Swiss-Prot record:
Source species of the chain: Arabidopsis thaliana
Protein name, per record: Defensin-like protein 242
UniProt superkingdom: Eukaryota
Keyword Disulfide bond recorded: yes
Cellular component terms per the entry's GO annotation: extracellular region
Assigned protein family: Belongs to the DEFL family.
Record GO biological process: defense response to fungus; killing of cells of another organism; signal transduction
Coiled coil: none
Keywords annotated in UniProt: Antimicrobial, Disulfide bond, Fungicide, Plant defense, Secreted, Signal
Signal peptide location: 1-22
InterPro entries the record matches: SCRL (IPR010682)
Subcellular location(s) per record: Secreted
Pfam families to which the protein is assigned, alphabetical: SCRL
Amino acid sequence: MKVVAIFLASCVLFSLIPTHLSHEEPKVAPTEELMFAPSNQPRYCRSRQVFDGSCTDRGTPRTTCFLDFLGARSASEMPKNCDCTPQPNNKRLCECSVICTDCCVKN
């Protein structure tokens, strides 16, 4: 009787081994992959704005204009590649690339 119990226990244990050793990742259906893929790419336009102060008031000229645009506009415009041009009367002209109002280019 002990031999039969040991044999059955061994069979059960050995039948479980292949399921624990297979570490395959579940396959993702192509439709699920497309659901999470970005369908639109943001389109950037150059935008200008005049601010008070010099180009180095808040660090480098690029940083100063970047921070000016963030403070004066919505962060969703995502300013980048900013340039600063000193102007008369302690002013600065900031020009940054921001997301255009029509936003995105369809793929």
